[in-house]
Amino acid sequence: MSDMRRVLPLLAAVVCLASASAVPLRVPPVRERAARPHAALAQPPVLANLSGLAHTVEVSITAAPARLSLVPGTTSEVFAYNGHVPGPTLDVHEGDHVIVHFRNALPEPTTVHWHGLHIPAGADGSPLDPVMPGQRHDYVFDVAPGTAGTYWYHPHPDRRAGYQVAMGLFGAIVVRSPDDPLPASIPEKLLVLSDNRFRADGSIDFPDSQSAQAEMDAENGREGNVLLVNGQLAPTVDIQAGEMQRWRIINASAARIYRLAIPGQQLLELGHGAGLLGKPLRMQDILLANSQRVELLVRGAGAPGSAVALQTLPYDRYDPHTRPADWNQTHDLLSLRVTGVARDSSVRVPDSLRPVPAIDTTHVAEHRVLVLTQGMINGKMMDLTRVDFTGRLHTTEIWEIENLVGMDHPFHLHGFRFQVLDRDGVPEPFPYWLDTVNVPPHSSVRIVVRFEDFAGKWMYHCHILDHEDMGMMGILQLH
């Protein structure tokens, strides 16, 4: 169903809870923007390159309070990168030297974590390196060869990541390759998925840390009553009949796992996680866990004037004892509207996209076991002064991640991409690159990772942000 009955309720039955996390904000006037349902999908602006040098990208990002219209008829006090939610896109190429001049104009410490990028620990933006209010910090790194794909950036302060992301701090990263296998003529769309909990007046409902709702959020993860795409409610994407579009989709939600589908169509999956797959896959639906990204080819199907919805189907990620009553609903995210007939619908998708060699497991330096429970890894909560594992550069490790509880835990390793070996002992059918893997309830996933470079301290954690903030995180020290 493509009407508003399948969009999450905007204003009905919203519990108005006081927010102890709220801080006094000095916010500018409301910035005009389309906040009406079914408006054309807007693309986030691209960060302007301030450098005049070849293969150098120099940009400026400020995190600051702002007022935006996200829910129709209301305004919301948010945190925003350069005044936008989502923030501007960092668009770079493999091999680029990147300089980010960051300014923290928030009333609290923050960081910028470049999720999925293979960069030095000092540039990672972990909670070990907070940027205090009023301070500036330069993040400097090189974009690694062979890492073309879709990534994102978001804050990672100690115990406050969930709050700051909920307030609006997230943006996309696109890494391009000179040998992209897809024709440059294919139109490209960026879709940043988020959800939030809004009160009737448009204010963001982030509950008091001592409230019953906060306790439930810490258990389940905080899901919203409004789903947004690029900060818009139920936008529309126009496509011509027979036209193909390349969609880069990012799950920027704190806890919601999306199960993406377009009724009556197969999805042609090009990439999942840290770059393209070895070959395209045809899928009926695609599971996108927190912080994961997917690249799709979508074809305009149907007669001009017809429309279908990109939907998120029901997915039970919850503990049976705390599962919300409405978990099994289908929600429309956007409308795909056929506007005409494509002049050229003969675009050919290559059978092979790029080589993805399997990581060699002949010589494995360490086999580690990480046991995930509620709020803890291996029975411990996060301590920024403690190193949980020590490893060596130029080695390969296998990690077995065991989830002992009744809900999903998306597991993220900073700084390094990895490959899945098997799930509950069943071998993965082919290698591909990830930086976050979903671990379902009462299951185990084995991953293999090669630590070739970049010494330092690296975080690993559950990417349900409420769990991360609760302490479901550890530190790997590489020498």
Give a label for each model feature.
Residues L11-A18:
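Bacterial N-terminal signal peptides
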